[in-house]
Swiss-Prot record:
Cell membrane is among the record's keywords: yes
Keywords: Cell inner membrane, Cell membrane, Flavoprotein, FMN, Membrane, Oxidoreductase
Location, primary (coarse class): membrane
Entry membrane topology: Peripheral membrane protein
UniProt GO MF annotations: FMN binding; L-lactate dehydrogenase activity
Organism name: Bartonella quintana (strain Toulouse)
Encoding gene per record: lldD
Protein name listed in UniProt: L-lactate dehydrogenase
Location in or out of the cell: Cell inner membrane
Keyword set includes Cell inner membrane: yes
Catalysed reaction, written as an equation: (S)-lactate + A = pyruvate + AH2
Residue intervals of the FMN hydroxy acid dehydrogenase domain: 1-380
CDD domains reported in the protein's UniProt record: alpha_hydroxyacid_oxid_FMN
């Protein structure tokens, strides 16, 4: 199969993965309207083509916090990445290091902080939810610091898990889910051998380390559901801000007022995000939400954005809308599932080449030159 885009990697991943895993990463909340709009609204942003601009060499690098990145891209935190390829978090982290960008380890990863650190050293980021078990939160923050993590991504848009209809149909949840997953693995022998058997242990590495017992995938949904805390407020995060001495990013901002409060709270950055359309269906796409947020907090903190990004062109669009850098999640998981570490590296090369073409044809030499003037019109998003 010829692979030339994220969409090709998606097709390859769909063939290779058992349905319960493919649809878990591919699906969204409820009727998936927001998930679809995330992509559609980005495509509605027309780039402003310019000619004879003497562009020459294009510089894709940026400085993000204290890191120099080769691309304005960060691999987003994705739970259970280690189920999409054998020791998937390690492979994705190695690919990110090879391409000079950060990898963000999810707190509900298969591979633990210690395992990832042993493979790639320091420099990766870590993601954490607000959970009822404050002991776990403190413990994992201490372990992440010892592993060399200096950037914490705090997910704030998940006080309760979103309802994802696809999961019940695919076997991730619903009646006879365990039996259905076993049957799916039988008819996907490559995944069953390479990941299902050779990729063990399949536990939540960071949680198991804290509880000192194996937390299997069967326990995954129950453990998360029991620990999400819908009663949290800004004051509940203050101890974390005081405790954590590194950079702190709040992920899941969609409203300008919340962005202002993030500045007042002392966040170093935000991720404008609707969780890839996986939490509350019917909310604004990131492409729609981003400009108003950028208008009120640009210069006060670093702005990242995710949701709907499938190409280097989409990265340029997000930056033109006000982002300093972009996170990608589904896209790199498709590549990881299809071709492992090399797949993620190839995907990032595709993104880089697409960015170079887009920047050259819009007349900009460096990422910092991408502005709202790089867009021809946003009328389609403002109707």
């Amino acid at each position: 199969m010829i692979i030339s885009s994220t969409f090709d990697y998606r097709k390859a991943a769909k063939r290779r993965l058992p349905p319960f895993l493919f649809h878990y990463i591919d699906g969204g909340a409820y009727a998936e309207e927001t998930m679809r709009r995330n992509y559609a609204d980005l495509q509605a942003l027309a780039l402003r083509q310019r000619i004879l601009r003497q562009v020459g060499e294009v510089d894709l690098s940026i400085k993000l916090f204290d890191q120099r990145l080769n691309l304005p891209i960060v691999l987003a935190p994705v739970g259970l990445t280690g189920m999409y390829a054998r020791r998937g978090e390690v492979k994705a982290a190695r690919a990110a290091v090879a391409k000079g960008i950060p990898f963000t380890l999810s707190s509900v990863s298969v591979c633990s902080l210690a395992e990832v650190h042993a493979e790639v050293g320091s420099g990766f980021w870590f993601q954490l939810y607000v959970l009822k078990d404050r002991g776990f939160m403190r413990d994992v923050l201490e372990r992440s610091w010892l592993a060399g993590v200096r950037t914490l991504v705090f997910t704030v848009d998940m006080p309760v898990p979103g309802a994802r209809y696809r999961d019940a149909h695919s076997g991730m949840s619903g009646p006879y889910a365990g039996l259905r997953r076993i049957l799916q693995a039988v008819v996907h022998p490559h995944w069953a051998w390479n990941v299902g058997i050779m990729g063990r242990p399949h536990d939540l590495g960071n949680v198991s380390t804290y509880l000192q017992k194996k937390i299997t995938l069967e326990d995954y949904v129950g453990w998360l559901g029991a620990n999400f805390d819908p009663s949290i407020g800004w004051s509940d995060l203050q101890w974390i801000r005081d405790f954590w001495k590194g950079k702190m990013i709040l992920k899941g901002i969609l409203d300008p007022q919340d962005a202002r409060e993030a500045v007042q709270f002392g966040a170093d950055g935000i991720v404008v995000s609707n969780h890839g359309g996986r939490q509350l269906d019917g909310v604004l796409s990131t492409a729609r939400a981003l400009p108003a947020i950028a208008e009120v907090v640009t210069g006060d903190l670093t702005i990242l954005a995710d949701s709907g990004v499938r190409s280097g062109l989409d990265v340029v669009r997000m930056i033109a809308q006000g982002a300093d850098a972009v996170m990608i999640g589904r896209a790199f998981i498709y590549a990881l599932a299809a071709a492992g570490e090399k797949g993620v590296m190839h995907l990032l090369d595709l993104f880089a080449n697409e960015m170079r073409v887009a920047m050259t044809l819009t007349g900009v030499r460096a990422v910092k030159e991408i502005t709202h003037e790089s867009l021809a019109s946003t009328d389609a998003l403002n109707q």
